[in-house]
Protein backbone atom coordinates (compact mmCIF):
# COMPACT_ATOMS: atom_id res chain seq x y z
CA UNK A 1 0.00 0.00 0.00
CA UNK A 2 1.36 3.40 -1.02
CA UNK A 3 -0.23 5.98 1.24
CA UNK A 4 0.43 9.66 0.50
CA UNK A 5 -1.45 11.49 3.24
CA UNK A 6 -3.62 14.24 1.80
CA UNK A 7 -3.36 12.85 -1.74
CA UNK A 8 -3.99 9.15 -2.40
CA UNK A 9 -3.89 5.53 -1.31
CA UNK A 10 -2.64 3.11 -3.98
CA UNK A 11 -2.62 -0.66 -3.66
CA UNK A 12 -0.29 -3.09 -5.42
CA UNK A 13 -1.15 -6.79 -5.41
CA UNK A 14 1.58 -9.06 -6.77
CA UNK A 15 3.00 -12.53 -7.03
CA UNK A 16 6.17 -13.90 -8.57
CA UNK A 17 8.11 -17.01 -9.43
CA UNK A 18 11.85 -16.54 -8.84
CA UNK A 19 14.93 -18.73 -9.24
CA UNK A 20 18.12 -17.87 -7.35
CA UNK A 21 21.52 -19.37 -8.06
CA UNK A 22 25.03 -18.82 -6.78
CA UNK A 23 27.63 -19.61 -9.41
CA UNK A 24 30.31 -18.76 -6.86
CA UNK A 25 30.11 -17.60 -3.27
CA UNK A 26 30.50 -13.98 -4.37
CA UNK A 27 28.36 -14.04 -7.54
CA UNK A 28 24.57 -14.31 -7.43
CA UNK A 29 22.01 -14.64 -10.23
CA UNK A 30 18.29 -14.13 -9.81
CA UNK A 31 15.77 -14.79 -12.59
CA UNK A 32 12.05 -14.12 -12.29
CA UNK A 33 10.31 -15.42 -15.43
CA UNK A 34 6.86 -14.53 -14.11
CA UNK A 35 5.94 -11.50 -12.04
CA UNK A 36 2.33 -10.31 -12.06
CA UNK A 37 1.35 -7.04 -10.40
CA UNK A 38 -1.98 -5.26 -10.36
CA UNK A 39 -1.86 -1.62 -9.33
CA UNK A 40 -5.01 0.30 -8.48
CA UNK A 41 -6.13 3.46 -6.72
CA UNK A 42 -8.12 2.86 -3.57
CA UNK A 43 -8.68 6.52 -2.71
CA UNK A 44 -7.85 9.97 -4.15
CA UNK A 45 -8.48 13.29 -2.42
CA UNK A 46 -10.06 16.17 -4.37
CA UNK A 47 -6.68 17.97 -4.28
CA UNK A 48 -4.95 15.00 -5.93
CA UNK A 49 -7.78 14.55 -8.46
CA UNK A 50 -7.26 18.18 -9.47
CA UNK A 51 -3.51 17.55 -9.96
CA UNK A 52 -4.15 14.41 -12.02
CA UNK A 53 -6.66 16.22 -14.24
CA UNK A 54 -4.04 18.92 -14.98
CA UNK A 55 -1.25 16.46 -15.84
CA UNK A 56 -1.64 13.82 -18.58
CA UNK A 57 1.60 12.21 -17.34
CA UNK A 58 0.17 11.69 -13.83
CA UNK A 59 -3.11 10.44 -15.27
CA UNK A 60 -1.30 7.66 -17.15
CA UNK A 61 1.30 6.83 -14.46
CA UNK A 62 -1.35 6.55 -11.74
CA UNK A 63 -3.99 4.64 -13.73
CA UNK A 64 -5.10 1.15 -12.71
CA UNK A 65 -3.06 -1.42 -14.66
CA UNK A 66 -1.50 -4.86 -14.83
CA UNK A 67 2.28 -5.16 -14.90
CA UNK A 68 3.26 -8.62 -16.23
CA UNK A 69 7.04 -8.73 -16.26
CA UNK A 70 10.28 -10.71 -16.22
CA UNK A 71 13.44 -9.71 -14.34
CA UNK A 72 17.09 -10.79 -14.21
CA UNK A 73 19.64 -9.59 -11.63
CA UNK A 74 23.37 -10.19 -11.39
CA UNK A 75 25.24 -9.22 -8.23
CA UNK A 76 28.84 -9.40 -7.13
CA UNK A 77 30.23 -8.84 -3.64
CA UNK A 78 33.98 -8.83 -3.12
CA UNK A 79 35.45 -11.07 -0.42
CA UNK A 80 34.90 -9.87 3.15
CA UNK A 81 38.61 -10.18 3.86
CA UNK A 82 39.38 -7.28 1.49
CA UNK A 83 40.20 -4.03 3.24
CA UNK A 84 37.99 -1.94 0.88
CA UNK A 85 35.17 -4.20 -0.39
CA UNK A 86 32.73 -3.46 -3.22
CA UNK A 87 29.18 -4.49 -4.12
CA UNK A 88 27.78 -4.27 -7.66
CA UNK A 89 24.35 -5.24 -8.97
CA UNK A 90 22.74 -4.95 -12.42
CA UNK A 91 19.04 -5.60 -13.00
CA UNK A 92 17.15 -5.85 -16.28
CA UNK A 93 13.32 -5.88 -16.27
CA UNK A 94 10.87 -6.04 -19.13
CA UNK A 95 7.10 -5.90 -19.04
CA UNK A 96 4.52 -7.43 -21.37
CA UNK A 97 6.65 -8.17 -24.43
CA UNK A 98 5.52 -11.82 -24.55
CA UNK A 99 1.92 -10.72 -24.01
CA UNK A 100 2.20 -8.21 -26.87
CA UNK A 101 3.71 -10.90 -29.11
CA UNK A 102 0.61 -12.99 -28.35
CA UNK A 103 -1.59 -10.09 -29.41
CA UNK A 104 0.46 -9.76 -32.63
CA UNK A 105 -0.13 -13.45 -33.39
CA UNK A 106 -3.86 -12.61 -33.45
CA UNK A 107 -3.51 -9.59 -35.73
CA UNK A 108 -2.90 -6.68 -33.34
CA UNK A 109 -0.05 -4.27 -34.08
CA UNK A 110 2.86 -3.90 -31.66
CA UNK A 111 2.22 -0.14 -31.44
CA UNK A 112 -1.54 -0.43 -30.81
CA UNK A 113 -2.53 1.24 -27.56
CA UNK A 114 -5.24 0.20 -25.11
CA UNK A 115 -4.55 -3.55 -25.25
CA UNK A 116 -5.85 -5.20 -22.09
CA UNK A 117 -5.22 -8.12 -19.76
CA UNK A 118 -8.31 -9.26 -17.81
CA UNK A 119 -10.15 -6.15 -19.10
CA UNK A 120 -7.51 -3.78 -17.68
CA UNK A 121 -4.69 -2.01 -19.55
CA UNK A 122 -1.21 -3.40 -19.05
CA UNK A 123 2.16 -1.66 -18.83
CA UNK A 124 4.92 -2.26 -21.35
CA UNK A 125 8.47 -1.10 -20.65
CA UNK A 126 12.16 -1.96 -20.48
CA UNK A 127 14.14 -1.01 -17.37
CA UNK A 128 17.86 -1.25 -16.58
CA UNK A 129 19.33 -0.42 -13.16
CA UNK A 130 22.79 -0.63 -11.66
CA UNK A 131 23.89 -0.18 -8.07
CA UNK A 132 27.52 0.14 -6.98
CA UNK A 133 28.99 0.75 -3.53
CA UNK A 134 32.50 0.76 -2.15
CA UNK A 135 33.56 0.88 1.48
CA UNK A 136 36.83 2.37 2.69
CA UNK A 137 38.04 1.40 6.15
CA UNK A 138 39.39 4.67 7.63
CA UNK A 139 40.11 3.50 11.16
CA UNK A 140 39.20 0.48 13.23
CA UNK A 141 35.80 2.00 14.08
CA UNK A 142 35.01 4.25 11.11
CA UNK A 143 34.28 3.70 7.44
CA UNK A 144 33.49 5.84 4.42
CA UNK A 145 30.99 4.48 1.90
CA UNK A 146 30.50 5.65 -1.68
CA UNK A 147 27.26 4.67 -3.38
CA UNK A 148 26.04 5.17 -6.96
CA UNK A 149 22.66 4.06 -8.28
CA UNK A 150 21.71 4.65 -11.93
CA UNK A 151 18.93 3.49 -14.16
CA UNK A 152 16.75 4.12 -17.16
CA UNK A 153 13.19 3.05 -17.94
CA UNK A 154 11.64 3.22 -21.40
CA UNK A 155 7.88 2.88 -21.82
CA UNK A 156 6.67 1.89 -25.29
CA UNK A 157 4.05 -0.11 -27.15
CA UNK A 158 0.96 -0.28 -24.97
CA UNK A 159 2.24 2.33 -22.48
CA UNK A 160 2.85 6.07 -22.60
CA UNK A 161 4.75 6.11 -19.30
CA UNK A 162 6.13 3.60 -16.82
CA UNK A 163 3.89 2.59 -13.91
CA UNK A 164 4.31 4.63 -10.73
CA UNK A 165 5.86 1.64 -8.93
CA UNK A 166 8.57 1.28 -11.61
CA UNK A 167 9.68 4.91 -11.67
CA UNK A 168 12.89 6.04 -10.02
CA UNK A 169 12.78 8.19 -6.90
CA UNK A 170 14.94 10.00 -4.39
CA UNK A 171 14.19 10.56 -0.74
CA UNK A 172 11.66 8.88 1.47
CA UNK A 173 7.91 9.25 1.92
CA UNK A 174 7.88 12.70 0.30
CA UNK A 175 10.08 11.62 -2.58
CA UNK A 176 10.45 12.99 -6.08
CA UNK A 177 9.75 10.49 -8.87
CA UNK A 178 11.16 10.74 -12.38
Functional labels for PLM-detected ranges:
Residues 1-151:
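Transmembrane beta-strand segments of outer-membrane beta-barrel domains in Gram-negative
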Residues 143-178:
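Extracytoplasmic gating/loop element in the C-terminal half of outer-membrane beta-barrel translocons
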Amino acid sequence: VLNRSGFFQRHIVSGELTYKTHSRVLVHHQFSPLIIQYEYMKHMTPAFTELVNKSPYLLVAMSDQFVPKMRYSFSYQSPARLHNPIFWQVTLSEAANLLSLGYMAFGEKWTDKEKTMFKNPYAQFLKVETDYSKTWQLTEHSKLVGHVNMGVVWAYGNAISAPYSEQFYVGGANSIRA
